[in-house]
Amino acid sequence: MSKILKIIGREIIDSRGNPTIECEVLLEGGFVGLASVPSGASTGSFETWELRDQDKNRFMGKGVQKAVEIINNKIFYSLKNKNAIDQFDIDQTMINLDGTENKSNLGSNSILSVSLATAKAAASSKGMPLYQHIAEINNTPGVFSMPLPMINIINGGKHANNNIDIQEFMIQPISAKSITEAIRIGAEIFHSLGNLLKDKGMSTTVGDEGGYAPNFKSNEEALNVIQDAVHKTKYKLGKDITLAIDCAASELYNKTRKKYQFIGEGTEFSSQELTHYLKKLSNKYPIISIEDGQDESDWEGFLYQTKELGNSLQLVGDDLFVTNKNILKKGIKKGVANAILIKLNQIGTLTETIETIKIAKKFNYGVIISHRSGETEDTSIADLSVGTASGQIKTGSMSRSDRTSKYNQLIRIEEILNKKRAPFYGLKEVKSSF
């Protein structure tokens, strides 16, 4: 009843108005899986290859018709009549068919859409939700947890058209007793921030990930405004709420000058100076998690930063690790960072993603499941976070349905599983001494 009968790829639109792929997998018995894939703005150089048409007369070269054709022909005929429940076989068949290290023949966007749609179809054929099927793929059946959210309330960098250098300013509702409560707290602070910005005569337009995107004189001004917004609620910064930032430092790094250029502030830092700057911020504000605090290729800089800050703060590798198990192993061996950001489309299949999560957890690295700046209504990452008991999730702000769809899915899952079957550990999941 789980044999693949048909695979259909189609070109749809993502949250930035760019084309992306949606895939439908039909199994015998009438079971169907539907999945769509995201796309990043600030991408790591070592991510797998996203196949685009490069036809400048159509979608400014970003069309995915070639990828859709590959799904409907090459991939379909390689997977036809296969057992959808055997996710490893499905993914490995596509990896072998592609034959490259970075999936540049078929495109990781083609492969991932089929991988996720197949998993959803298989879950349907087994009469279970996706998170339960993922737990079984993970060889941890029945083991679930609800993640602590990093809620992005101010967007900067490549995610917004403003002058803020740091790409994401996030809040973590650490006093919450459930994901549902954490989401409510996040929404209340999001609205408090919006009202405060209005009172200051500042813009309340939002960036790619749904956070506010005004101009600020400095990163510290952004942090001060967040601090004020929290104070205007019943919550206490440092007690109920902690902060997290994504520097996306690779986007700030000038390779010619070998400096990190904070253009919005009119200053620049060496590798070590950037670490000292981030240390100063974390001493002044309750920042407990810093993502990509160095350029993706600056392993020495990351090692220094880990030695300086790693005992007290969660240091997250995104562009550094790109959800690649081999790069993560290198980081573990060198003692670089203490957490990893997981993005399905950085590596391109569900099984490879799960394998990377397993390695991270084995070596006590924090795991944060993440969206991309160009998203769809697909909620697979919510199920992935619960089904692998990853502990943390980063899926944007409290606006834009491409972001809130994931939060709403987590609310539904928590309602089904309740706290006994899927505990919410909150702050315990963060690799910091806070």
From Swiss-Prot:
It is found in: Cytoplasm; Secreted; Cell surface. Gene3D superfamilies: Enolase-like C-terminal domain, Enolase-like, N-terminal domain. The active site is at E209 (proton donor), K343 (proton acceptor). The keyword rRNA-binding does not apply. Its main location: cytoplasm. GO terms for molecular function: magnesium ion binding; phosphopyruvate hydratase activity. One of its GO terms (biological process) is glycolytic process. It comes from the Bacteria. Component of the RNA degradosome, a multiprotein complex involved in RNA processing and mRNA degradation. This is Enolase. The gene is eno.
